[in-house]
Amino acid sequence: LSVARGNYFLTLLSAFLITIILLIGFVVSDTHILYGVFIVLIGIVLLRLFKINLLSFKKLTMSQVIYIIGGALLIYGLDYLYLHFHDVPTNEQELDRELQHMPLYMSIVTIAIIPAIVEEIVFRGMIIRVVFRKHLFIGLVVSSLVFASLHESDTWIGYLPYLYSGVIFGLIYLKTKRLEVVILIHFINNLSSLLILLWG
């Protein structure tokens, strides 16, 4: 399941550089959408230049499409159960306030598309497949915990939706070996949350 065949430490250094660029693009996209998209694209191009093969851009198979649909439905179902017993996470309350002053197209790009691409490349791609490429289960655990911890919550239980989402993304990624699959699941999850916040 290796995505880079070169020296481990050189690959790690390249991955760190690309991660910084992607995260800068992520942050910049909140206020300057075109600059943010451009920076993220630079990060994706650098993946190819440094031969870190996280994205294949091949046509999805039917089984991968089923994983996308199933993964999105599973997360939606778990979110529904969570919200039945707990309040809306702080992170989504913050998003709700931001959306009041943002055009729809900008909301979709900055809340649904860019986070899905950047977070999956960084958390599932870089952490699982680069940092822990010989210890994938440890990578799955670490990536899920870091992914959850970087989202905002006032309570421990508030991190739960991000934790189980991270685990599901990681498991499906390891099963399908296609980062595009979990990017699409993540995008669908973000988009559905966005639409519910806007019109729910």
For every predicted segment, state its role.
Residues 2-16, 50-81, 132, 138:
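Interfacial transmembrane-helix boundary/kink motif in multi-pass membrane proteins
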Residues 5-51:
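Alpha-helical transmembrane segments in multi-pass membrane proteins
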Residues 9-13, 65-69, 105-109, 137-142, ...:
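Hydrophobic alpha-helical transmembrane segments
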Residues 16-25, 72-79, 144-152, 187-197:
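Aromatic-anchored segments of alpha-helical transmembrane domains
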Residues 23-28, 158-200:
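Functionally important transmembrane alpha-helices
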Residues 34-44, 105, 109, 160-168, ...:
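Membrane-embedded alpha-helical segments of multi-pass membrane proteins
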Residues 54-115:
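Juxtamembrane helix-loop-helix connectors linking adjacent transmembrane helices
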Residues 96-152:
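Function-critical hydrophobic alpha-helical transmembrane segments in multi-pass membrane proteins
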